[in-house]
Every structure is written in C-alpha cells, then in structure tokens.
C-alpha cells in the first residue's frame, strides 16, 4: 500500500499547489527526420569484448560545455548505425537528417537546486523491491526486462527493447555473449509450477533453454537415463521467473560503435534490440526528454534488476540535479545490473485529464566523467532528444514516415 501511495499520489499532489504551477503536459511537436541513405555490409564482429559498466573516462556535462555544437555532417555520422543479426552478420546504415535547424551555440547545462553527490547508496536505501504480483505483472513495472549480459532494458514495442549500448558493445567490439543475446521477461507461474507456453516446439525449446538463469546454469530436472529433457527447472507456484526470448537483431548508433576510429561518446550509450517473438504485455512509449523545469517534482523514475537483489525487480525515483543537451545527472540509488533501464516520466496528455508515462532517457550507470580535468563518477542517464527519438523510431518502424512528431 505504501508503494502504491508513493507512485500514484505524488502525481495528484502536484495539482494542489499554487496557480502558477508549471504545465506538466506532453507537448507533441514536429521533429527532424532521420532517413536511411545506404546500407553497407561489414565484416562479422568477433564478440570478444568484456562487458563493463563503462570504457575509460567519458566526456560528461562539464566536458561537453567546452565543446562546440556538432555540425550537420557530424550528427549524420553519429546517427548512422550498425546492425548485427543473430547469424553474426553486420551492416552499417548511413543516414541523412532532414528538417533540422542548427543552433550555433555550445552545449549548455542547467543546474538543479541541489549540489551533486558522489554515487553510492546513501544511508537508508530508497529502492523498492517489487514483489507483489499485482504490481509486478502490471504496467509500468512489467515493461522492465533483463538482458542475458546482465543489464536491464525496457519494452518499447511488442518486438523491441531499449537498453544501454555498453550492455552489448564496448565501443570497439560486441561483448561476449551478445551473439546469442536473450531478453528475460518476468512471468508468474501457474498451478503445477510451470508457466503457459505457446507456439512451435522449436520456439518453446529456445525459450526453455534460454530461460535457464545465467546465475544458476547447472539447474536441471530429474530425467530418465539416455533421454534429454526439454523441460526447464520447476519453480514454486506463485513465484515469478524469467521467460527468455532470443534477440533477432541489435541496432547501435555509430556515435557509440566507433571501432578503431575513437572512443565511444556517452551521449550515444543506447541500443535497440529486436526480439524474435512479440511480447503480449503492455509496453511503454518513447517521449522526447523535457527540461528539468518540466519534470513533476524534478523527479524521474525507473525499474531494473540490480545485482544485489537476486532476480528482483527494483523500483526507484529521485531528483535530477543537472542536465545538458544529451545527459542527466541524478541521485537515484542503483547497483550494477540496473544499467540500461528506461527512465520515465508521468505527464498529462494534451487536452486531457489523463496522465501518461513515457520513456525519456536510458540509465547509463555510474560513469567516470571528466569534470574540469578531474575524474569523478556520477549517476548518468542519456536523454532522448528529438534526433534520438527520430532514430529509435526509425529502428522500430522501419521508415521515417511514422516518426514526424514526438
């Protein structure tokens, strides 16, 4: 009951303030279009990179303030993208940006009311483990997924998961295990300790073999000698377990997948995974990230699978302290495993009384950033800007015609 009050009542109390309250509404506007120009076949990756939270030191908000705004050709290069398929083949798609008005200004930052703090879990842990199936199997918590590489992600369509790029690629190569990448969705078990399974025998075998938790690879059921069992381990009735689905293809912006041409840019630490099987639960739509002043209470929300809470979905909310054009610094208590989670807001629908949640950033994790020549680590999220919205929308729909507004 306490969790319910925290999640839902907070939105109602915003309307009880003064008449000068900000307009917390999703405002749709025409955005630039990212259009595919040509696709080039590349050599297959080796899938030998080690999965890590971040590669070296990245350019954070203070570092970005000293950089000039990128040109149109640079943006088109950053937004061009790699696609790697389940059979190991890889392509590079060059894009063109249409309808963009460039502003000849440097990257700017906006500071919140509070000074930033170094990352850790402070005093009383403010995270909530979602254990009640009434929450766990319902929106918005059922949009959170787990990657077999150890990260989290968010379902943004029946067939697509948004996550952090570093969960599958270190900037030079794809990480070990990403060639047979799987996505796990928490499901409740039915009577008898098994979840319902539909579809072909082949897809069931994939789900069951993939459903073996990476943390417990040796679990198995008793079987007759000489006969292979296709059935996964039994789970106690009423307990959630992961249903695993193979990833069909992975899209990563060239701003992150630099190869030998440079270090990955933190601004582009996001990736989209296309699943082999559509998911039936409700997904969360994308939204363009508003400024701090447009956040109700200055807060953001996200749920993920923190490593210190074994296979539990963990929810948290916190304040944003500072933002640039592409990044957010925030105070959320989080541990490894939650990176890649979709950060969302709850704002009003235009012209309606209804409130709607949308994903406006991807949690990149505890990153080492360059702050005036000194290395410091902070909680960082990558904002979904109009251009990134257009790019991710192109990945989801396959054409720019469906991505005119965001």
From Swiss-Prot:
One of its GO terms (cellular component) is extracellular region. Its main location: secreted. It comes from the Eukaryota. Keywords: Disulfide bond, Glycoprotein, Secreted, Serine protease homolog, Signal. Residues 1-17 form the signal peptide. Glycans are attached at residue 87. InterPro entries: Glutamyl_endopeptidase (IPR050966), Peptidase_S1_PA (IPR009003), Peptidase_S1_PA_chymotrypsin (IPR043504), Trypsin_dom (IPR001254), TRYPSIN_HIS (IPR018114). Residues 186-204 have a biased composition (Basic residues). It is found in: Secreted. The keyword Disulfide bond applies. SUPFAM superfamilies: Trypsin-like serine proteases (SSF50494). PANTHER family: INACTIVE SERINE PROTEASE 35, SERINE PROTEASE. Belongs to the peptidase S1 family. This is Inactive serine protease 35.
């Amino acid at each position: 009951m306490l969790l319910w009050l925290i999640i839902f009542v907070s939105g109602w109390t915003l309307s009880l303030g003064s008449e000068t309250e900000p307009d917390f509404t999703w405002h749709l506007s025409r955005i630039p279009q990212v259009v595919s120009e040509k696709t080039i076949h590349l050599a297959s990756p080796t899938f030998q990179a080690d999965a890590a939270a971040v590669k070296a030191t990245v350019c954070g908000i203070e570092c970005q303030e000293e950089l000039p705004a990128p040109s149109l050709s640079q943006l088109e290069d950053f937004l061009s993208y790699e696609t790697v398929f389940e059979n190991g083949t890889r392509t590079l798609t060059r894009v063109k940006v249409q309808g963009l008005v460039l502003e000849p200004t440097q990257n700017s930052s906006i500071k919140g009311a509070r000074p930033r703090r170094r990352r850790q879990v402070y005093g009383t842990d403010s995270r909530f483990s979602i254990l009640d199936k009434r929450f766990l199997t319902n929106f918005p918590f059922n949009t959170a997924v787990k990657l077999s590489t150890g990260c989290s992600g968010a379902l943004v369509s029946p067939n697509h998961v948004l996550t952090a790029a570093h969960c599958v690629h270190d900037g030079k190569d794809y990480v070990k295990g990403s060639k047979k990448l799987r996505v796990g969705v928490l499901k409740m078990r039915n009577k008898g300790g098994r979840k319902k399974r539909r579809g072909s025998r082949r897809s069931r075998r994939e789900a069951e073999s993939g459903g073996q938790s990476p943390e417990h690879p040796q679990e198995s059921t008793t079987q007759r000698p000489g006969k292979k069992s296709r059935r996964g381990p039994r789970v106690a009735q009423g307990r959630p377990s992961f249903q695993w689905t193979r990833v069909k293809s992975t899209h990563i912006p060239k701003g992150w997948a630099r190869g030998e041409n440079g270090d990955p840019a933190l601004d582009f630490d996001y990736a989209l995974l296309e699943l082999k099987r559509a998911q039936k639960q409700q997904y969360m739509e994308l939204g363009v990230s508003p400024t701090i002043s447009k956040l109700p209470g200055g807060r953001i929300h996200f749920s993920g699978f923190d490593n210190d809470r074994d296979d539990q979905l963990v929810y948290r909310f916190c304040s944003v302290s500072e933002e640039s054009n592409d990044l957010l610094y925030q105070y959320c208590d989080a541990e490894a495993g939650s990176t890649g989670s979709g950060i969302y807001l709850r704002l009003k629908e235009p012209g309606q009384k209804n409130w709607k949640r949308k994903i406006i950033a991807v949690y990149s994790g505890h990153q080492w950033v360059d702050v005036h020549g000194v290395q410091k680590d902070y909680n960082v999220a990558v904002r979904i800007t109009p251009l990134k919205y257009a790019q991710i929308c192109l990945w989801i729909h396959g054409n720019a015609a469906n991505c005119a507004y965001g």
